[in-house]
Amino acid sequence: MSKGTLFDKVWDLHTVGTLPSGLTQLFIGLHLVHEVTSPQAFAMLRERGLKVLFPERTVATVDHIVPTENQARPFVDRLAEEMIQALEQNCQENNITFYNIGSGNQGIVHVIAPELGLTQPGMTIACGDSHTSSHGAFGAIAFGIGTSQVRDVLASQTLSLSKLKVRKIEVNGTLNPGVYAKDVILHIIRTLGVKGGVGYAYEYAGTTFEQMNMEERMTVCNMAIEGGARCGYVNPDQVTYDYLQGRDFAPQGADWEKAVAWWESIKSDADAEYDDVIVFNAADIPPTVTWGITPGQGIGVNQLIPQPEELLEEDRFVAEEAYRYMDLYPGQPIKGTKIDVCFIGSCTNGRLSDLQEAAKIAKGRHVAEGVKAFVVPGSERVKKAAEAEGLDKIFEAAGFEWREPGCSMCLAMNPDKLEGRQISASSSNRNFKGRQGSASGRTLLMSPAMVATAAIQGEVADVRELL
């Protein structure tokens, strides 16, 4: 395993064989399931008379469609109720662990798996959700998959995949005050483009990542897919082990010491060979805001929306489309853009540390008149921990709504949606047209602290002015 990257080692250890097509048949150590992409997969198994091969390696929760205001059953939305009932039935029939609403462990799938200790270094992880790359923060190789692949994993615990190249992205130095993990990943995507990572796994490295806690690393890995990479990961270290130790599904006792020794062995070697290496300086990264309709259309909060001629030729068409859709123009400051709705939450930024940073901004201040602002914890555990610290009271005193866990306005498969031409400041991961529920709604991505700042000021503003 000399000169190997973590990706190479984990891939090779989980390779079942090479198929006639040339694809690798890869064993999946953990399969995460939710209510949106699984019903058809379970139905396909039934049609073929198949059972779930390894139910003990499958864990389910409900997150995408759950309302965050009133979670009483049956849901008002009939389709949402049907979807959760289908998941309940499928899990019961197949002996799959299911964390339902009220279990104490329900939440966004990419939040609950790490906090339960299910996500561990060296694993291969799959889920029918684009942002499965989040789990790479632990040194796992994690893929988002489609419904037919969900079926394949349920039936065979394997996926047929092409091996990726590995790009090392180093970020070195200490982030300036008011600059967060969300700014790091938005800056990377802005620089490399939304297609820059196609065909790659991204290894995030450097002193900046060494200084990050696990929740910050999850934020970065969560959005690897937005930069075109199939997955992103950080090598495990003592920060990883400290986070995992004592969690529900983490190894215990003598097994813990064995696990750590093995986790150390699968880290990228010092002389590992990469297909590409790109280096960033943390000091160059500003609080970042997206202005357009892709996560790559980002600028520093004090910068101007770019002129077409400042962009690469292949980016100009999408930029022109973004100017029209967003009703923004080249050379306009993003700072001062009026905001209608502020959303703090999602699998990108719905964890405890995200809420803590936003609460620092909200404390002793109040949401601007005419702005709707709400906070959605990423899980029942996050909600409980935040309430134990009094964060809910801080937010409510500042005029924010405090909600129940769920995906919420990240994708608007639930009642949390923009209306008409509303523009939101959002801590989520996608700003596509119509992403937040209105066909003409507009989304500006930023860190939770920046969202809180926008809520207080009623417009895009620099969080550093409130620190």
UniProtKB/Swiss-Prot annotation:
Keyword annotations of the record: 4Fe-4S, Amino-acid biosynthesis, Branched-chain amino acid biosynthesis, Iron, Iron-sulfur, Leucine biosynthesis, Lyase, Metal-binding
A biological-process GO annotation: L-leucine biosynthetic process
EC number: 4.2.1.33
Cofactor(s) the protein needs: [4Fe-4S] cluster
MF terms in GO: 3-isopropylmalate dehydratase activity; 4 iron, 4 sulfur cluster binding; metal ion binding
Keyword 4Fe-4S assigned: yes
Binding site for [4Fe-4S] cluster: C347, C407, C410
SUPFAM superfamilies given in the database record: Aconitase iron-sulfur domain
Pathway given in the UniProt record: Amino-acid biosynthesis; L-leucine biosynthesis; L-leucine from 3-methyl-2-oxobutanoate: step 2/4
Record text on cofactor binding: Binds 1 [4Fe-4S] cluster per subunit.
Pfam families noted in UniProt: Aconitase
Enzyme class: lyase
Transmembrane segments: none
Family matches, as InterPro entries: 3-IsopropMal_deHydase_lsu, Acnase/IPM_dHydase_lsu_aba_1/3, Acoase/IPM_deHydtase_lsu_aba, Aconitase_4Fe-4S_BS, Aconitase_4Fe-4S_dom, IPM_dehydratase_rel_enz, IPMI_cat
Reactions performed catalytically: (2R,3S)-3-isopropylmalate = (2S)-2-isopropylmalate
Family (UniProt): Belongs to the aconitase/IPM isomerase family. LeuC type 1 subfamily.
Quaternary assembly: Heterodimer of LeuC and LeuD.
Function: Catalyzes the isomerization between 2-isopropylmalate and 3-isopropylmalate, via the formation of 2-isopropylmaleate.
Protein name, as recorded: 3-isopropylmalate dehydratase large subunit
Gene name, Swiss-Prot/TrEMBL: leuC
